Amino acid sequence: MIETGKIINGDCIEVMKTLPDGSVDLIVTSPPYNVGINYDTHIDTLDMDVYWDWTKEWLTQAYQLLKDDGRVSINIPYETNVQNRGGRVFFVSEFYQVMKQVGFKFFGIVDLEEDSPHRSKTTAWGSWMSPSSPYIYNPKECVILAYKKHHIKKVKG
């Protein structure tokens, strides 16, 4: 049994392997987006195929941890730009395809919008004063809501 309210810090895949299957009601997470953020222990510039394999691995572990009426809430961007690793990615679509492969069932999506996007000063000019290659920054993110087998909770409260 997992201690209520306990925060566990560590590599998500390794930690999830130590927890009992079918013991979790809800997982809330915001995984790395693979856009080059300088994390202490995670490489955020993986080849996209490697990134999706890693995503499938941790989602599989999460799926096993959930109770049959368990749910998952995952904060991700709608799209990303991984310039030298394949260009623009419709991230939410790719991510959801992996979730379906693992077995998750879609419940909904929550649209998020940054009040003051940290990159809002990025222009869409591309080359100086030329529309040849505009840069588009989408400040919106979303939360994908999904469940394991049963949307309705067996135990209320």
For the regions a protein language model found, what residue spans apply to each?
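Core catalytic lobe of class I
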Residues: M1-G157
